[in-house]
Amino acid sequence: MIEPLLLGIVLGLIPITLAGLFVAAYLQYKRGNQLNID
């Protein structure tokens, strides 16, 4: 049985982690375009 607290923490961290990775990838992609790096 999964503890509700642990389940809540996991469900709370997953969207934040995905959002963080997306933002980091977007910033790197944008920076790469500015520097004209392929």
From Swiss-Prot:
Keyword Transmembrane helix: yes
GO molecular function: electron transporter, transferring electrons within cytochrome b6/f complex of photosystem II activity
Cellular-component GO terms for this entry: cytochrome b6f complex; plasma membrane-derived thylakoid membrane
Top-level division of the source organism's lineage: Bacteria
Pfam families linked: PetG
GO biological process, one term: photosynthesis
Key words, A-Z: Electron transport, Membrane, Photosynthesis, Thylakoid, Transmembrane, Transmembrane helix, Transport
Protein's membrane topology: Single-pass membrane protein
Subcellular location: Cellular thylakoid membrane
Keyword Transport attached: yes
Subunit structure: The 4 large subunits of the cytochrome b6-f complex are cytochrome b6, subunit IV (17 kDa polypeptide, PetD), cytochrome f and the Rieske protein, while the 4 small subunits are PetG, PetL, PetM and PetN. The complex functions as a dimer.
Family, as annotated: Belongs to the PetG family.
Function summary: Component of the cytochrome b6-f complex, which mediates electron transfer between photosystem II (PSII) and photosystem I (PSI), cyclic electron flow around PSI, and state transitions. PetG is required for either the stability or assembly of the cytochrome b6-f complex.
Protein name: Cytochrome b6-f complex subunit 5
Annotated source species: Rippkaea orientalis (strain PCC 8801 / RF-1)
